[in-house]
UniProtKB/Swiss-Prot annotation:
Residues annotated as catalytic: D158, C161 (nucleophile), H280
GO molecular function: cysteine-type deubiquitinase activity
Name of the protein: Deubiquitinase OTUD6B
Ranges for domain OTU: 150-287
Species this protein is from: Xenopus tropicalis (Western clawed frog)
């Protein structure tokens, strides 16, 4: 590989890393917006998750740069050999000096050993996770859904998961309501039926029921931020869509919201341990048996 080609590859790699860092910062901002500032427990977990995401990206970038560097010729060693040959005194038959290992090479070898140790720890953690809460929950939900000839349809964890899961279900029925539509209609319905929702909303700092101003902000956040949706929002959506919404969970019986409606229920999957931030909603789809039969 000549020097120009090497520089071009290195420049491309650095540009890629910059883009990935920008993308991660956008994701982090979305994560921050999805957790209320007064929810100290989830904010603390959020800080830990963000730190892990940034650390993982930093480690991967270092590994990629290290791999790139190892593909390049070692200029110190080449020059060392050349200098040794040109300094030979044939008359005195001086011994040829062996090229010394550069400091950069020593650092790379030390780094490689550290990364190998880290990879081994990650592998051990992955094995341990097979008995962890997240894996057990996923396995149990898969069995529950398989009995209905269904499987989980993964939904991004971005604060919109509940609305995205419902959007997916509606599209399967020919309904083109979007996440933005669902959020807007949910907020409008809750504001127009405040007496049905206010008693269930309390200030996490004082324990008091929301004031009218706090309730208005809550509804405004539904529309303007990726605020996480829960049972109150599901209740509103059930009335808006005039459809029952069934929530399947691993550790207890399904919850059905809007049982008064007779149309086919929308089915969601509630996962308590799916992500570091906690609760998450997925959608469902027909079970794909092709992999089992292949």
């Amino acid at each position: 590989m000549d020097e120009a080609e090497g520089n071009s590859e290195e420049s491309g790699l650095i540009k890629q890393h910059r883009k990935e860092k920008r993308d991660l910062q956008a994701k982090i901002q979305s994560m921050k917006n999805s957790v209320p500032k007064n929810d100290k427990k989830r904010r603390k977990q959020l800080t830990e998750d963000i730190a892990k995401l940034e650390a993982d990206l930093d480690v991967r970038h270092k590994e990629e740069l290290e791999a790139f560097a190892q593909k390049q010729p070692e200029p110190t060693q080449v020059s060392g050999i050349t200098n040794g040959v040109t300094s030979l005194d044939l008359g005195n038959e001086a011994p040829v000096q062996q090229p010394r290992q550069s400091k950069a090479q020593k650092r790379r070898e030390k780094k490689a050993a550290q990364e190998k140790e880290r990879d081994e720890r990650i592998a051990e953690a992955e094995i341990a996770n097979l008995s962890g809460a997240r894996h057990l929950e996923s396995q149990k939900l898969a069995r529950i859904l398989a009995e209905r000839e269904l499987q989980i349809r993964q939904i991004p964890s971005d604060g919109h998961c509940m609305y995205r899961a419902i959007e997916h279900q509606l599209r399967e029925r020919g309904n083109d309501l979007t996440v933005a539509n669902l959020r807007s209609q949910t907020a409008d319905y809750m504001q127009n039926h405040a007496e049905d929702f206010l008693p269930f909303l309390t200030n996490s700092s004082t324990g008091d029921m929301y004031t009218q101003e706090e309730f208005l902000k809550y509804c405004t956040d539904i529309v303007n931020t990726p605020a996480w949706g829960g049972q109150l929002e599901l209740r509103a959506l059930s009335h808006i869509l005039k459809t029952a919404i069934e929530v399947i969970q691993a550790e207890s019986s399904p919850i059905v919201i809007g049982e008064e409606y007779s149309s086919k229920a929308i089915t969601l999957v509630y996962m308590r341990h799916a992500y570091g931030l906690g609760e998450h909603y997925n959608s469902v789809e027909l079970l794909d048996t092709s992999t089992e039969n292949s």
